[in-house]
């Protein structure tokens, strides 16, 4: 604890194995085939499709239900993947209307009446969570738990937050400039 984290400043080519191959990041997303882009100052390439990319949508759904976000018991990564593939959930809102597919869920391998009932109860119990957890659950880039708390304190209500986020997207607005 308290140690200095070293910064990578270059490659020591003399230490590289002779048979090593230069890594080339993919120019196209392996999920949706959209062009990838590496923003200046960032270490990773990103798919430019956003929520249109199935892989990004699935990962956002996983984050949304994760322990530090909505913390929905019984709705783990594998189940999210299966429900997305079957078209049962496509976005955050679908999670809260999944009860409409109760009969369909009960027929799935590994899911029975009791586990589906427990899942629906768990989802129902999370209809109200703290504002900071909601902000964190949205998976906004560079908004972790600490920034989510700060945003919740700043805006107090979801409506205030929503209004400011709409302003921030408006190129004619003075917000966040």
Give the positions of each predicted feature:
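Flexible glycine-rich surface loops and low-complexity tracts that mediate binding to linear polymers
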Residues: 1-7
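Accessory alpha-helical DNA-binding modules that contact the DNA backbone or grooves
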Residues: 3, 12-177
């Amino acid at each position: 604890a308290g140690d200095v984290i070293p910064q990578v400043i270059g490659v020591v080519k003399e230490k590289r194995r002779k048979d090593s191959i230069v890594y080339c990041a993919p120019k196209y997303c392996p999920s949706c085939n959209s062009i990838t882009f590496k923003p200046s100052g960032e270490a990773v390439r990103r798919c430019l499709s956003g929520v249109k990319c199935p892989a990004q949508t699935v990962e956002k759904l996983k984050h949304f239900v994760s322990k530090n976000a909505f913390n929905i018991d019984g709705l783990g990564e594998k189940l999210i993947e299966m429900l997305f593939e079957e078209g049962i959930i496509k976005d955050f809102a679908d999670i809260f209307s999944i009860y409409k597919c109760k009969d369909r869920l009960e027929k799935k391998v590994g899911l029975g009446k009791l586990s589906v009932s427990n899942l629906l109860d768990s989802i129902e119990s999370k209809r109200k969570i703290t504002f900071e957890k909601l902000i964190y659950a949205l998976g906004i880039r560079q908004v972790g738990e600490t920034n989510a708390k700060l945003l919740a304190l700043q805006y107090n209500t979801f409506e205030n937050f929503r209004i400011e986020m709409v302003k921030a997207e408006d190129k004619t607005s003075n917000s966040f400039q």
